[in-house]
Regions:
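Substrate-binding/active-site clefts of carbohydrate-active enzymes
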Residues: 1-88
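Core domains of carbohydrate- and sulfate-ester-processing enzymes
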Residues: 2-21, 152-168, 342-343
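A short, structured beta-strand-centered segment in the mid-to-C-terminal lobe
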Residues: 32-33, 37-40, 246-257
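Conserved alpha/beta catalytic core and glycan-binding cleft of carbohydrate-active enzymes
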Residues: 55-57, 72-238, 245, 266-322, ...
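Catalytic cores of secreted or luminal carbohydrate-active enzymes
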Residues: 249-271
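Acidic, Ser/Thr/Pro-rich beta/coil linker or hinge segments at domain junctions
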Residues: 336-358
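C-terminal beta-strand-rich structural cap/linker in extracellular carbohydrate-active enzymes
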Residues: 350-389
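Intrinsically disordered, polybasic Lys/Arg-rich low-complexity tracts
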Residues: 386-433
């Protein structure tokens, strides 16, 4: 930037001299010349200073994609390819690998987070495996999808159901952070509360439901300050948060909700022990788009599941059937529609026993009371033994090959009838002779 190191001594000092590599035309900023050892040393020293002198817990590297691609934000013919003729910035790749290697060698417990908005492979994989060496990456795809979905009128959400399910197609390819960051609440985009459709009660319900969906979705979490207050105004670095809102009941209630939701997250190890692999997640229902609902399981390392059911419609769904992985008693552990959070107090409050009714590809199920614009979470408090099926039930479930097996008596009668017919035929021929 012009207020920083831009042409520090009157000409390119820290940046590339060639404008095809040294300038971001969309932003009007300069690009560090990462091929020069003195520039790399300067950046390494800055990173270490923040960690060692200011004791920062970690660093987030902004706009990583703009450094990895030589053609980022540039028209054809306005960028310079690498020595192999490609668009990858080989110097930036080497820089990130060396930076992360040096930092983790000195401080193995810090966070190195990449804001990388493309599908660049192995951002959070070890350098030894050809990765960039970060330990976390912002999930920009999830953020864009969810911010598009929450702004929609609930009627139109059924046509955009993939916005809340597609992220599971790649959720475990990197170590992701789900970011509701400052980028989404600036420049007239509206606050998180302001994005929600409906009246005030529906807006607050939407915040509670989508934040809980975020907590139960695989990946670490990041939320912009002020969201926990139900802030109406966008975030701005020149102003403080609107703390005065806590004098109003709806904002005190949403504040209480965030405290309770975060405490629940810490208590339920299934939500964070295995959020980097399919071992910790299992879809129950991902395609009920007409109802705007999804249901899934989260598993901890002891194979103890949570059942999560989300309803992103304003319709109260009584008698909603949900599949279960095994029989038992399932108790609600969190309800975003609780009165203490500003909700209507709908939803289950007592444990539910499973029944032998198949649902969602599971042999067991339960029927729940699913409030409008809410998320319900259940855990098994008492696991029942699996009931052995009777022989008659097994026989009823057997698939036949097209030939029905007859009872023994019927088989004997059929054989006797055939023998009688054969005797009559022989006798008739003898008479004719």
């Amino acid at each position: 930037d012009a207020f920083g190191l831009y042409h520090f001594d009157g000409g390119p000092t820290y940046e590339y001299a060639d404008a095809r590599k040294g300038e971001h035309p969309d932003w009007g900023t300069q690009v560090f010349d990462l091929g020069r050892s003195e520039v790399r040393s300067f950046l390494f020293s800055n990173a270490m200073f923040w960690l060692e002198e200011y004791h920062a817990d970690g660093l987030r590297v902004d706009a990583v994609s703009s450094m990895l691609y030589l053609d980022y934000g540039r028209q054809d013919g306005a960028w310079m390819p690498n020595i192999h003729g490609g668009k990858e910035n080989l110097e930036a790749i080497e820089f990130f690998q060396k930076l992360n290697t040096a930092i983790f060698a000195a401080h193995p417990d810090v966070l190195m987070i990449a804001e990388e908005s493309t599908a660049w492979p192995k951002v959070t994989h070890p350098v030894s495996d050809g990765g960039l060496g970060f330990n976390f990456k912002w999930n920009m795809g999830w953020m864009n999808d969810i911010c598009h979905y929450i702004k929609l009128d609930p009627y139109f959400r059924q046509f955009n159901h993939r916005d809340i399910t597609f992220s599971l197609m790649y959720a475990f390819s990197e170590n992701y952070i789900l970011p509701l960051s400052h980028d989404e609440v600036v420049h007239m985009k509206g606050s998180f509360l302001g994005k929600m459709p409906g009246d005030n009660a529906e807006k607050f319900a939407g915040v509670r439901a989508f934040y809980t969906y975020m907590l139960t979705h695989p990946g670490k979490k990041l939320t912009i300050m002020g969201t926990e207050l139900g802030q109406w105004n966008e975030w701005h670095y020149e102003y403080s948060l609107d703390w005065h809102l806590l004098q109003y009941e709806p904002h005190r209630q949403i504040h209480q909700f965030f405290k309770a939701a975060n405490a629940m997250y810490l208590e339920q190890s299934a939500l964070w022990e295995q959020d980097d692999s399919w071992q910790g997640f299992q879809w129950l229902c991902a395609d009920d788009n007409t109802a705007n609902t999804v249901a899934f399981l989260r598993w901890d390392r002891e194979r103890r599941p949570l059942v999560v059911v989300a309803n992103f419609s304003p319709i109260h769904r009584k008698g909603y059937q949900v599949g279960l992985p095994f029989p038992g008693t399932w108790a609600p552990v969190f309800n975003t529609d609780a009165e203490e959070f500003g909700g209507a107090g709908l939803g289950d409050t007592t444990p539910i026993k499973s029944v032998d009714i198949p649902c969602h590809d599971q042999e067991q199920s339960m029927t729940i009371d699913l409030p409008p614009m809410s998320v319900m979470i259940y855990r098994c408090t008492r696991r029942a033994p699996v009931r052995k099926k009777k022989d008659s039930e097994k026989a009823g479930e057997k698939k036949t090959s097209g030939k029905v097996k007859k009872p023994e008596g019927a088989k004997d009668a059929g054989t006797a009838a055939k023998k009688t017919q054969a005797i009559k035929t022989v006798k008739k021929k003898d008479d004719q002779a």
